[in-house]
């Protein structure tokens, strides 16, 4: 055995050139990262994958000394060095082995033969044939090579690998690529030739085919693929879905890399039941502080127009389109912000989102928001302005008032014994009369509102375990109001009191000044308990609030942005009965609440129970609309909330608001959830009185009374079952049903899912059913084809999965 330490790196350089050349070509679908986490499959799939090895930070791999071992070293005449028998070359973490290696000192040609092995800590290459290389030109050629990427299941082979131009150009002939474990090659990508130019973004493959087991299933005469995390103009992979509403739905996107900070995606979407839709998205970022996008969809003629009453009754033809603009800008070291969120569909196209499900736009209660905002923010003050309009997506909905604009100023100051806040707002409320007329609605009152409210908060007691705060507020509001003669009958009826004495709205200047006094306090008691088989800490937290606001009749003021607040535990300790500023309710009320929590010995909250109720000394007299019946109730609904972490698997939640005067539930919600590793199941229920559209009687409302069941569970190491079921109990309507089955192996998966969704038509308000079937086949590390989602999410098309448990650290 001969061992030498050399001052040059000739022998190791034979294969050093392989790494930068070969890696991008075969790793483009799976970067050099740890194997993908698949949970229970990890130990079964990836035990053969070698770990990534690196030198210590700061060390240069090329500067490390080279050690060569061989059974025999022979120096031939003419300057040729021959290494024979168990040749081993080491340089840092790099390793190179062969049976025979020959170096011509003059031509700088190198030949290695037999049992070739190369490992640089990131990739391993082996061959039983020949490696030829030149140390000056860096051109190399390897016959019948196999490769395995470290930290990744990516592996494969090539009949011949040729590297030229200082390793910038690589050609692989007879190449194969897979992420399947050895002996389990479910899929393999084979190509007659692959060319890589490392100065380019994409590699190119000719005569490529995808094989499943021993059978070719797809053939690509030519295909390109990314070798860098950069963008390039060209066709993207097509998409395909199938649904009962649109039928076969095929998308073919084309990507246009205009510049490093500008690009566009142009997509042709063919729906065999509707026609051809064009989609264009343009994205821009002139610098990191300014970013935005423009998006447009256009369907020239919807083939469903003549057959769909909700379309041909609302629009004159089948032309359908959507426009979306989104922009954000930051100025003055991010102190100033400007944002635009604008989405529009064709007028009276109420079902556009139901039919095409675009992934853009902000929808709030069947209204498309169109907003331009600007703000300037400092530590103790800020000023914001917003212009906001809406487009209605529900034929029977009343057109809302628009902000034209709103200017809002907030000031905060914290002293040693007080907190001062001052909110000032100026809003001009407009109304889209043209759209209202298009919806067969009349005009509406408009106005300008000025509101200012200084608020002084003084802590009276602030000790460990108890506190008492007092708050003083003075609210001044001024309206300049206009009331048209052709006002919508909806508004006329709302502002006509029960006695029928005529519309109460006043025109001109209206002022309102109201003081507010608030006293709020609470205490916390603790005791140690022996619960859950260990030490626990239980708290008892009583709290109270007294709120006084004098009465002032406000029936002459229009309702622009106000609505009744949702009733729950927390609303009982608010200083408002109405959201918005158009109605400030009188109040002479005491709210009392009691919360108890249990913490285990680790400090995790395991149980939270809370109950509260408010008592009015005088029933409030302010109403949202004069037509409403004045309530004489002096007690709020009794509010209850409870959460429990029963153990590491079981969680429970319940909440209810009980109307003690009418002896009935106002609302309730509950959930019971079981979680263990990848198994999640949840049974939930929600009830809200008079909060749902009556699908049998148009224009009427009924109770929302819905039960849901969700499940996702592994059946074994490979099979996974998931689904969701939502049922409207009062209307016997199955809101959403979804069931799926997924098979997941080391290198491929297949997912079947079937879903039925019932949503009301936004014109007829009749339920419409949508059925979709998804089949998703994924080759890990290569891509996926098919329809539907490849995940096992608990989300359904109609409702998202929510964990309603209000426990700390959960």
From Swiss-Prot:
Transmembrane segments: none
Localization, UniProt: Cell outer membrane
Keywords annotated in UniProt: Cell outer membrane, Membrane, Signal
UniProt keyword annotation of Cell cycle present: no
GO biological process: Gram-negative-bacterium-type cell outer membrane assembly; lipopolysaccharide transport
Cited InterPro entries: LipoPS_assembly_LptD, LptD, LptD_C, OstA-like_N
Main location: membrane
The keyword Lipid biosynthesis is annotated on this UniProt entry: no
One Gene Ontology cellular component annotation held by this UniProt entry: transporter complex
Signal peptide from the UniProt entry: 1-29
Pfam family, one: LptD
Function per UniProt: Together with LptE, is involved in the assembly of lipopolysaccharide (LPS) at the surface of the outer membrane.
Homology family: Belongs to the LptD family.
Alphabetical list of HAMAP family matching this protein: LPS_assembly_LptD
Subunit structure: Component of the lipopolysaccharide transport and assembly complex. Interacts with LptE and LptA.
Protein name per Swiss-Prot or TrEMBL: LPS-assembly protein LptD
Organism expressing this protein natively: Aeromonas hydrophila subsp. hydrophila (strain ATCC 7966 / DSM 30187 / BCRC 13018 / CCUG 14551 / JCM 1027 / KCTC 2358 / NCIMB 9240 / NCTC 8049)
């Amino acid at each position: 055995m001969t061992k030498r330490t050399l001052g040059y790196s000739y022998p190791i350089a034979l294969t050093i050139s392989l790494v930068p050349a070969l890696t991008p070509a075969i790793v483009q679908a799976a970067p050099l990262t740890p194997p993908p986490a698949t949970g229970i499959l990890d130990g079964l799939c990836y035990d053969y994958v070698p770990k990534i090895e690196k030198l210590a930070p700061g060390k240069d791999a090329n500067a490390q000394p080279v050690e060569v071992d061989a059974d025999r070293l022979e120096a031939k005449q003419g300057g040729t060095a021959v290494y024979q028998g168990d040749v081993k070359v080491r340089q840092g973490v790099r390793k190179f082995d062969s049976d025979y290696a020959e170096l011509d000192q003059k031509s700088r040609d190198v030949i290695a033969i037999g049992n070739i092995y190369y490992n640089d800590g990131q990739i391993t290459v082996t061959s039983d044939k020949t490696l030829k290389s030149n140390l000056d030109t860096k051109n190399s050629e390897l016959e019948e090579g196999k490769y395995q990427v470290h930290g990744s299941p990516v592996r494969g082979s090539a009949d011949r690998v040729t590297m030229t131009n200082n390793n910038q150009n690589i050609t692989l002939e007879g190449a194969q690529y897979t992420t399947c474990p050895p002996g389990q090659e479910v899929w393999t990508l084979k190509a007659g030739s692959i060319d890589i130019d490392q100065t380019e973004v994409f590699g190119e493959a000719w005569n490529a085919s995808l094989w499943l087991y021993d059978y070719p299933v797809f053939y690509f005469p030519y295909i390109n693929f990314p070798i860098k995390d950069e963008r390039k103009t060209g066709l993207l992979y097509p998409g395909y879905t199938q649904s009962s509403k649109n039928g076969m739905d095929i998308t073919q996107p084309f990507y246009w890399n205009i510049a490093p900070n500008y690009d566009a995606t142009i997509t042709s979407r063919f729906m065999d039941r509707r026609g051809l839709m064009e989609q264009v998205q343009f994205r821009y970022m002139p610098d990191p502080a300014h970013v935005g996008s423009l998006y447009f969809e256009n369907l020239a003629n919807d083939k469903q127009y003549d057959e769909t009453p909700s379309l041909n009754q609302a629009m004159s033809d089948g032309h359908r389109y959507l426009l979306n603009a989104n922009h954000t800008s930051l100025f003055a070291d991010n102190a100033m912000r400007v944002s635009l969120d604008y989405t529009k569909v064709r007028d009276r196209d109420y079902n556009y989102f139901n039919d095409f499900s675009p992934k853009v736009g902000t929808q709030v209660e069947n209204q498309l928001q169109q907003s331009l905002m600007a703000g300037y923010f400092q530590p103790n003050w800020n000023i914001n302005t917003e212009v906001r309009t809406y487009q209605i997506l529900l034929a029977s909905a009343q057109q809302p008032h628009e902000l034209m604009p709103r200017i809002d100023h907030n000031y905060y100051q914290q002293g040693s014994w007080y907190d001062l806040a001052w909110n000032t707002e100026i809003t001009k409320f407009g109304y889209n009369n043209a759209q209202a007329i298009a919806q067969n609605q009349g005009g509406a009152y408009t106005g300008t509102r000025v509101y200012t409210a200084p608020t002084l908060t003084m802590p009276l007691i602030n000790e460990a375990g108890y506190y008492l705060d007092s708050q003083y507020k003075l609210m001044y509001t001024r309206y300049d109001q206009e009331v048209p003669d052709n006002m919508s009958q909806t508004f006329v009826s709302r502002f006509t009191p029960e006695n029928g004495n005529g519309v109460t709205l006043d025109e001109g200047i209206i002022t309102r000044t109201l003081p507010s006094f608030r006293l709020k306090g609470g205490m916390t008691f603790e005791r140690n308990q022996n619960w859950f088989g260990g030490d626990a800490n239980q708290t008892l937290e009583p709290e109270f609030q007294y709120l006084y606001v004098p009465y002032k009749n406000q029936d002459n003021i229009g309702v622009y942005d106000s609505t009744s607040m949702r009733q729950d535990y927390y609303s009982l300790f608010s200083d408002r009965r109405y959201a918005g500023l158009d109605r400030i309710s009188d109040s002479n009320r005491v709210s009392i609440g009691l919360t108890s929590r249990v913490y285990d010995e680790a400090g995790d909250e395991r149980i939270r129970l809370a109950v509260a109720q408010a008592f009015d000394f005088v029933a409030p007299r302010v109403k949202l609309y004069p037509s409403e019946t004045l309530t004489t109730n002096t007690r709020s609904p009794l509010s209850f909330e409870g959460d429990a972490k029963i153990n590491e698997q079981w969680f429970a939640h319940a909440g209810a608001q009980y109307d003690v005067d009418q002896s009935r539930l106002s609302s309730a919600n509950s959930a019971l959830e079981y979680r263990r590793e990848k198994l999640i199941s949840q049974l939930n229920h929600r009830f809200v009185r008079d909060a749902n559209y009556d699908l049998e009687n148009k224009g009427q409302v009924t109770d929302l009374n819905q039960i849901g069941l969700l499940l996702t569970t592994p059946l074994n190491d490979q099979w996974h079952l998931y689904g969701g079921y939502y049922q409207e109990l009062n209307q016997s309507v199955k809101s959403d049903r979804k069931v799926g089955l997924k098979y997941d192996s080391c290198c491929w998966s297949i997912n079947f899912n079937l879903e039925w969704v019932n949503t009301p038509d936004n014109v007829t308000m009749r339920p419409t059913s949508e059925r979709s079937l998804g089949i998703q086949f994924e080759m890990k590390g290569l891509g996926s084809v098919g329809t539907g989602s490849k995940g096992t999410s608990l989300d359904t098309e109609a409702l998202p999965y929510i964990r309603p448990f209000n426990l700390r650290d959960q």
